[in-house]
Amino acid sequence: MARQTDLLAIGDIVTDAFIKLIDDQAYVTENDQGKWLTMQFGTKLPFDHAEVLEGVGNASNAAVSASRLGLKTSFVTNVGDDKEGLSMIRALQKEKIDTSLVRVNARKVSNMHYVLWYKEERTILINHENYKYYWPHLRPDEIPRWVYFSSISENALEYHDQVSDWLDKHPDVKLAFQPGTFQMKAGTERLKRLYARSEVMVLNREEAEFVSGGKREDLHDMFDRLHALGCKIVVITDGPDGAYASDGNQRLKMPLYPDPAPPKERTGAGDAFASTFVAALAKGNSLEGALQWAPINSMSVVQQTGAQAGLLTEKELEEWLAKAPEWYKATQF
């Protein structure tokens, strides 16, 4: 009998084109609406170099992360019938991810995003193609222990209902929800079935404020509101301040793993954290153990370009954990 799938990722897959900006050709300003990347308008600007990375995106990054950590992984996604789509499928297969549920859309192009890379930060220009989303029929051996649902096009709202219907019919399947931009904008009322079904939800602090409607400075308030939606385990990442997690019984703070060198760029740090946290739970780790694993993969990812090059195997991750300083542990808050 075939081994059961451990994790099934759901979401859009993209090709990222990184454009490394020259430091003195742009600058960052800040106002009450946030930080802004500023460049001279209406002229030609030199750039350092460009890199193209295939088969990325929140859900794809999670699938690669889970597969490298030893989980049997599959992926439900859409690509166009172009060379980029074929290249992305091959990239997934190279990572030992089952691509039998990847749908190739005739006469459609594949998703392409452009990443403006300035110093160690990035601004991503996104555009999701309008595919016809529908939930596939899964054979018994394709039914996973975990579903990892993340960023998807804004025209896929009804698809969320199909996923929710399927989850209702398979109550033993655990859901990890890392909502993307359009999913958060859809609101908690529209996607209430997914929030209520979530075994794990991972958000950064800004996203947690938006989704919960709580006060950004009050973590406990945001946790209370997110648990009230039905989410069992909630994780809020907070940049240089580390991450916080709540399972309804305990609330823990986890520091960042120290960087061995200055970060190269930060694309995929959040995806690495979220997916590694979920993979750790799927492999039987405790909440504290999952919190120890996740920052290590984030640390490794930011040492490379893009969201996947730095993703670790379980052996590599455990080697970093063995070298962790004494203070690298979860504490109550």
List the predicted regions and their residue ranges:
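Active-site metal-binding loops of divalent metal-dependent hydrolases
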Residues: 12-13, 152, 272
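Conserved phosphate-binding/catalytic loop of the ribokinase/pfkB sugar-kinase fold
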Residues: 100-104, 113-158
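Conserved phosphate-binding/catalytic region of the ribokinase-like
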Residues: 1-8, 26-27, 216-333
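A short, aliphatic-rich alpha-helical micro-motif
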Residues: 2, 141-142, 195-196
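Glycine-rich phosphate/adenosyl-contacting loop at the front of the ribokinase-like
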Residues: 1-74, 86-87, 333
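Conserved phosphate/ATP/ADP-binding segment of small-molecule kinases
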Residues: 164-174, 180-253
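Structural alpha-helical scaffold elements that stabilize or flank donor/cofactor-binding regions
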Residues: 7, 139-140, 191-194
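A glycine-rich helix N-cap at a beta->alpha junction
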Residues: 91-108
